[in-house]
Amino acid sequence: MTVTKANPGSLAVGTPFNYAFTVTNAASAFGPATSVTIKDLVPAGISITGVPSGANVSSATCTPNTFPFMGNGTAILSCTVNFTAAVAAGGNTSFNLPAVPTAVGSSTNTASYDPSGGISPVNPTAGCTTDCASTPVTPVTPG
């Protein structure tokens, strides 16, 4: 299993956006993927505003489960996303994590995942490259 992550890039402070996650089940997978757990290292200046959602999301839970979840560069949000339809070997699905920039400045948001589909990914770090998905974001002053 692999997970990738994207966002709109440069956006105005206070403007809601989604981190878009794509989950791909390996063609060599032993079976379908029914869920994924991500741990998201939320940077300073970003606030997560709710649980993940998407067309193939049957339910999602996060720890802590208090929103908005204010990033500070060390705070980790752990979310388990359950899929409505299992993702077959070689298939993929996507979901969104809603957020809003709260301060001007560039940052990188990194999330980790368990490539075997387990529920205990390692805690992500700023330079994580193995079993992690990262995307830069640049909040700017509105106007």
Region locations from a protein language model:
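Exported/extracytosolic protein signature
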Residues: 1-143
